[in-house]
Regions:
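Conserved GTP-binding G-domain of TRAFAC-class P-loop NTPases and closely related GTPase folds
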Residues: 8-12, 17-25, 29-173
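Switch II (G3) loop of P-loop NTPases
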Residues: 1
């Protein structure tokens, strides 16, 4: 019932931990001559592609909530939060979270945008710690306090914002 009556859903996705087979297909195409010579190599299939896994999860949730897909969803709003955004290798100061999401999970992106109204879905980039913690940065992190280090990037923006509640404000705004 909480899902059905919610104003919005926030879904956190850590892109670096998601299995995406497009890269493996590219590797197979690039290395096909070497693979032909060594028939003992097989493609790894150690998990379901993230696009498929997330789409299936959304389909289950939409079914449980009895949200019909004959028309686009206006409620609940959907905020996709790309967590550990500072660790995403292809994020730059000129790319937006939306662009990263479209590139990394294209099938899921199409599924969500075909089911939600355009202004009822948003993609955010979140770094709750502001950096990856290692031996050197850990002490600096503790000295400066965690409350001063995180940031979020709003959809279609490049600038970091210290207000981590921005997606919640968007959902209720």
């Amino acid at each position: 019932e909480s899902l059905i009556n919610a104003n919005g859903w926030m879904v956190f996705i850590r892109l670096n931990d998601e299995t995406k087979y497009k890269h493996k297909i590219e590797d197979l195409l690039t290395n096909r001559d070497a693979i032909k010579k060594d028939n003992s190599k097989q493609a790894e299939t150690d998990g379901v592609d993230a696009n498929i896994w997330w789409i299936e999860l959304f389909q289950i949730v939409l079914h449980v909530c009895n949200l019909k897909r004959s028309q686009r969803i206006s409620k609940p709003k959907l905020a996709i939060i790309l967590s550990c955004y500072d660790q995403i290798s292809n994020s730059t100061s000129t790319t937006t979270p939306k662009e990263i999401f479209e590139k990394e999970l294209p099938l899921l992106n199409q599924f969500l945008h075909s089911n939600w109204e355009k202004d009822k879905i948003s993609i955010w980039g979140l770094s709750s710690l502001g950096r990856a913690l290692d031996g050197r940065s850990q002490n600096n992190f503790v000295d400066n306090g965690p409350e001063n280090q995180g940031w979020i990037i709003a959809p279609d923006h490049h600038e970091k914002n210290a207000d981590l509640t921005s997606p919640i404000v968007w959902i209720y705004g």
